[in-house]
Amino acid sequence: MQLFETEHAKYLHQTIQRMQVQRAAVQASGLPALKRLVVAAQRSSGQSAVVGRFLLGLYNGPTYPFTLTELRGLDQELHSDCMAVLLMDWSPEREVHEMIEGGHHIFQSLIARWA
């Protein structure tokens, strides 16, 4: 029984280490992508509207639902950024608006503009 407990503890430790490495990699690509998406959402274009609604969906999905097929209207770079941010938001340490400086005010302006 003790051997099982030792092996199980080792497995859990290795799993946690892998998750920490993965989380760091996801954040390394997700945070810059989030910053680019915020800039895009503050512009005035059809893509800006899609990105703004996407970000609001992550911010509060029940209040600001987002239709996934809208992502088809984005260019490849914005689409990739959305996927990176979505992956980062899958198991967040913080809410999406808390990951950027001035996020609360930025997201309030996105609500006023795109909700």
Predicted regions located by residue number:
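Membrane-embedded hydrophobic alpha-helical segments
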Residues: 1-3
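Short terminal alpha-helical segments
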Residues: 5-45
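Short, flexible helical or helix-coil boundary motifs
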Residues: 19, 41, 62, 89-93, ...
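Non-catalytic, well-ordered alpha-helical scaffold segments
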Residues: 31, 35, 48-56, 80
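Substrate-binding/catalytic groove segments of enzymes
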Residues: 47, 62-66
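Short, hydrophobic/amphipathic alpha-helical patches that form generic packing surfaces
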Residues: 50-61, 84, 88
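Polybasic, proline/glycine-rich intrinsically disordered low-complexity segments
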Residues: 67-115
